[in-house]
Amino acid sequence: NLLKREVAKYLPKWEKTTGLYCSSWQSKYMTTKWGTCNPTSKKIWLNLQLAKKPIECLEYVVLHELAHLKVHDHGPEFTAILDQYMPYWREHKRRLNDSTLDYLPSQLE
């Protein structure tokens, strides 16, 4: 699918750029988050709905989750990583936060 192709392109780019590597990644529908990760297992999950967003937003979420592999909270050290590698990350975050996540009835089943 489109998201898998885009992640296959951009995840290695950001891993190489930051030196932060995930063990694996998966996509799934999420109703409250664009991405999540498990720093212990170094696994990343990306919201399937990112396929419908501008590529810059996908790159931001990939970088955001990779940064969590090093820093677990959203404090100054975390934002410094984002600032270093993506100076306009706040704009991409705002763009995502201003958009909606789709509700899928099947999520209740």
Which sequence ranges carry the predicted segments?
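Walker B catalytic acidic pair
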Residues: 65
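Active-site-proximal or metal-binding-adjacent scaffold patches in catalytic folds
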Residues: 1-60, 69-109
